[in-house]
A protein has these predicted regions:
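Glycine-centered hinge/linker elements that transmit conformational signals in sensory
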Residues: 35-36, 72-101, 131
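Conserved C-terminal helix/tail region of periplasmic/extracytoplasmic solute-binding proteins
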Residues: 220-290
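Periplasmic solute-binding protein
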Residues: 1-30, 50-71, 153-162, 234-243
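C-terminal lobe and pocket-closing loops
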Residues: 127-134, 144-237
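Paired acidic/hydrophobic, glycine-rich loop segments that form the ligand-binding mouth/hinge
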Residues: 117-122, 136-138
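Short helix-initiation/N-cap motifs at beta->coil->alpha
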Residues: 29-31, 99-113
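Short, solvent-exposed loop/beta-turn-alpha elements that line the ligand-binding surface or hinge
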Residues: 66-86, 142-152
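A structural signal for multi-pass alpha-helical bundles of membrane permease subunits
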Residues: 312-601
């Protein structure tokens, strides 16, 4: 084979078993499930794992004779074997063998509380469990349905050297030492890593590490993960197929056909190479025009006099200009330049405006079809309008309430209501995602208390969108509240008193006096809040994750997927970013003119 680096650790999944619930080893998964049902408490599960993740589904797929990608890196998650594996996992969910909407934190909680007899997880869980529970680790068993073993995917951590580093003997020597038996023993004993040295595991010093040895045994029969780009591009469509089947939205065969179509679309050949001559000519013409205008200005005596008079002022702003150039202008220029290229970072190909044409023509498909720029733009606009409406409405009401001088504990309320804004957005997003979990989330628990039915919040666009909005409104209303409270302090009391003397009711005073005086402050805050919300990546990515099937993705999260989950198409993602910038710049300019016109009137 081809040597990419020096391997230092293996990673794969294995079976963690609660010894109090399943004291004996079972040859098949079905036997383990039957044994676990006899002892698990009511509401518990025989097995827990991240069923909607293709990495954790791979052992089931291999047991049915299927593969995620073939030896050439082509998407192979199709056919009868793949469909049978999806149907099998769906049956596990239907028969309450596994929980709904699982994740790593939920698996750990269920296992440690004795509500899950077994979990499928990687070695990291051993460090989290400690001695709080009696458990053992086993290689994954066979499936009685097929008689074949559940072989996990095997990944390898390795030491790599750059081209310059590989030419230095000391770098090669260090890499070899890190992969040696001596260093491997240290990583096993101190780092609890599964080193890829079978002979090392025969050392008597490691005989007591039974759980770690089980991972080493599992790694020996695991399926090595393909190092091709096709493998990287397979995760997203495979995950979506799993989620559709588990939700019951599609039959396995239809979900797999759609997954293959999306993989083909994401990995289709890049646009043909374009000539850079038009770009060079355009940049040259722009440079000449700029130089010509600069020469004309420099030859003007009045301009030279103004420059000499302003030199001291320029000295004060030079550092700020340099910072803006380094942190704003140059990154924007680099992003715009990247959008004109395709291919990998090591072998870029100039394609001109092909990325923009592909985005704006929906890659040759329906302009409002799944994942198109225009459909995602509509979702983004809806997302922005709804959020800003609630931000302003709630912020205005709370700001007015907290500005009443006779309100008791006013300072305490202000601090408490500002806290959602002070907490990092990703922390809040993860907390809200947990609250929207179908089986164990606080929101559904409240619905049950009120006599309602639990809701699968991320199974439909309306509920997933509502979950995202609720999270972002919680994050955003304190900003508007603070703006309103600050603006209210600038309203002269004598104006309000004069309106009251004239017989204006409380509603009339708010509508005809307070609100018009708040508008000059509120409108810029609304524009700023709209820009923030338009690009609110954390909430969309961490709460709904774009579910269901990417329908709640906004433009910035769609750009992220093209950059990092769809074959690393950085040029395509950069074109998305440029279009987002142009939309925001145009919108800000439009509203800026409106603000200027209203201020003048």
């Amino acid at each position: 084979g081809v040597r990419y680096g020096v391997p230092v650790a293996n990673k794969c999944v294995a079976l963690y078993v609660n010894e109090d619930l399943v004291p004996s080893v079972h040859a098949t998964l079905e036997e383990l499930v039957r044994a676990a049902r006899e002892k698990i408490p009511q509401g518990g599960f025989p097995l827990a794992y991240t069923a909607d993740n293709a990495y954790f589904h791979a052992p089931f797929l291999h047991a049915f004779g299927g593969r995620l990608v073939d030896d050439t890196g082509t998407f192979a998650f199709v056919g009868d074997e793949a469909a049978a594996s999806l149907a099998f996992v769906r049956s596990l969910l239907v028969h309450h063998v596994i929980p709904e909407e699982p994740n790593g934190a939920l698996e750990k909680q269920l296992f440690m509380s004795g509500r899950a007899a077994a979990v499928i997880e990687s070695p990291w869980l051993m460090g989290e469990l400690g001695t709080s529970i009696r458990y053992r680790v086993e290689p994954l068993p066979k499936l009685a349905a097929t008689g074949l073993p559940m072989r996990p995917l095997l990944t390898v951590e390795a030491v790599f050297a750059t081209k310059a580093g590989a030419a230095r003997p000391i770098a090669r020597e260090l890499a070899r030492w890190l992969g040696s038996a001596e260093a491997g023993m240290t990583r096993v004993l101190d780092g609890q890593q599964v080193v890829p040295r079978p002979a090392l595991w025969k050392d008597p010093a490691l005989s007591g590490l039974t759980n770690l040895r089980a991972f080493a045994t599992a790694a020996e029969s695991a399926e090595p993960m393909s190092p091709t780009s096709g493998m990287q591009a397979a995760w997203e469509p495979a995950n979506q197929a799993l989620k559709k089947v588990l939700r019951g939205d599609q039959e396995p065969e239809a979900a797999l056909v759609e997954a293959k179509r999306r993989w083909d679309d994401n990995t289709r050949p890049p646009p043909p190479k374009a000539s850079p001559t038009p770009l060079i000519a355009l940049l040259g013409a722009a440079s000449l025009a700029f130089a010509f205008m600069l020469v004309l200005r420099v030859r003007d005596p009045a301009f030279r006099h103004e420059v000499r008079a302003s030199l001291p002022a320029y000295a004060y702003v030079t550092h700020a200009v340099l910072v803006v150039l380094a942190l704003v202008v140059f990154p924007l220029a680099a992003g715009a330049l990247t959008s004109l290229f395709s291919g990998t970072r090591d072998a870029p190909r100039y394609v001109g405006l092909a990325n923009y044409v592909s985005i704006l023509t929906a890659r040759g498909g329906d302009l409002l079809g799944h994942g198109s720029f225009y459909l995602t733009l509509l979702v983004t606009v809806l997302w922005t309008v709804v959020n800003v409406f609630f931000h302003v409405s709630i912020g205005l009401v709370l700001g007015l309430a907290l500005s009443r001088p006779l309100l008791r504990l006013r300072a305490v309320y202000r601090v408490l209501l500002i806290l959602p804004w002070a907490v990092p957005s990703y922390v809040t997003a993860l907390a809200w995602k947990g609250m929207f979990q179908r089986q164990f989330g606080a929101v559904n628990a409240l619905l049950r208390m009120l006599g309602g039915e639990p809701v699968s919040w991320f199974s439909h666009f309306s509920t997933a969108f509502a979950a995202n909005v609720a999270t972002n409104v919680w994050l955003g209303f304190p900003f508007m509240m603070v703006v309103v409270m600050g603006a209210l302090t600038s309203i002269p009391k004598d104006v309000l008193e004069a309106a009251e003397v004239d017989g204006a009711t409380r509603g009339q005073r708010f509508r005809l006096v307070t609100l018009p005086l708040l508008k000059p402050v509120l409108l810029p805050a609304v524009v700023l809040g709209a820009v923030w919300t338009f690009n609110m990546f954390n909430v969309v990515f961490l709460v709904s994750g774009g579910e269901p099937d990417g329908t709640t993705d906004i433009l910035v999260s769609e750009a992220y997927r093209w950059a990092f989950t769809r074959d690393n198409q950085y040029g395509y993602a950069a074109a998305y970013a440029v279009l987002i910038f142009l939309l925001l710049a145009g919108g800000s300019r439009f509203f800026g003119r409106k603000l200027t016109a209203e201020g003048a009137s």
